[in-house]
């Protein structure tokens, strides 16, 4: 499994809240977020770790991680640019602003690995925890396969994507083609489901996206809370 971290965005909402530090470098639990993710990916067992970082941001990364500068108009474009540099094989991909405790990263990685090995074209991290300005809702069948991707809330139970994706070699090829006509990650995910490609889901209790200052504060409280006292 190859690892890919997407950090090509501007972080405009954090900046609007007065956070001047670029999103990959904001500190969560005492370390830059991108360093947290790199070390998480290494601990999970990713064979390689590629970080797509917005041009102009200097990142000092640990270990074997590779940083590629990019200036792209959307996360889908950043994904495709990253996939072009990642070694062959399945990919475990995360947005740089994705926060979870280690146990949930391990649970998610194991699920992604299992579902890709079983033949899924892609795997989505999903959570019932909805705290996003523009959530992407997912419906699924009894086997955990996605049946629909929606911008507005569907029938209960509500699940939303969490910024982590497992991508098979087939999904990598489809993304390279789709980017010519699609301009958002959610449009690509919706396309996969509409094509009736097997898109699996792995559920975790909570995922925080670092879009605003309040998200940074919530992530800090969550990850530094005493064991058994996380909220």
Language model: regions and residue ranges:
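Well-ordered alpha-helical segments embedded in enzymatic catalytic cores
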Residues: 33-36, 78-81, 187-188
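Catalytic-core segments of class I nucleotidyltransferases/pyrophosphorylases
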Residues: 92, 106, 145-231
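Residues at the starts of beta-strands that form the adenosine-phosphate
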Residues: 2, 47-49, 90, 121-122, ...
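Active-site glycine-centered loops adjacent to acidic/histidine catalytic or metal-binding residues
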Residues: 9, 97, 212
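Short, well-ordered beta-strand micro-motif
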Residues: 27, 85, 139, 166-168, ...
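Conserved beta-loop-beta/alpha segment of the NTase-like Rossmann-fold superfamily
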Residues: 58-142
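N-terminal glycine-rich phosphate-binding loop and ensuing alpha1 helix
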Residues: 1-58, 106-111
């Amino acid at each position: 499994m190859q690892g890919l971290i997407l950090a090509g965005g501007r972080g405009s909402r954090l900046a609007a809240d007065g956070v001047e530090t670029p999103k990959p470098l904001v500190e969560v639990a005492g370390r830059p977020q991108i360093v947290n993710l790199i070390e998480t990916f290494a601990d999970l067992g990713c064979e390689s770790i590629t970080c797509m970082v917005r041009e102009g941001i200097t990142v000092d990364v640990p270990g074997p991680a590779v940083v590629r500068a990019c200036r792209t108009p959307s996360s889908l474009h950043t994904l495709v640019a990253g996939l072009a540099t990642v070694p062959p094989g399945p990919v475990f991909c995360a947005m740089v602003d994705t926060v979870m405790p280690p146990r949930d990263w391990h649970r998610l990685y194991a699920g992604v690995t299992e579902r890709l090995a079983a033949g899924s074209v892609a795997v989505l991290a999903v959570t019932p925890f909805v705290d996003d300005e523009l959530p992407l809702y997912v419906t699924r069948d009894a086997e955990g396969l996605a049946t629909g991707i929606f911008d507005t809330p569907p029938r209960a139970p509500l699940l939303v994507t969490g910024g982590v994706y497992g991508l098979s070699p087939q999904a990598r090829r489809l993304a390279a083609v789709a980017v010519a006509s699609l301009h958002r990650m959610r449009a690509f995910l919706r396309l996969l489901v509409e094509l009736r490609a097997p898109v699996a889901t792995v559920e975790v209790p909570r995922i925080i996206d670092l879009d605003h200052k309040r998200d940074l504060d919530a992530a800090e409280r969550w990850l530094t809370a005493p064991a058994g006292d996380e909220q």
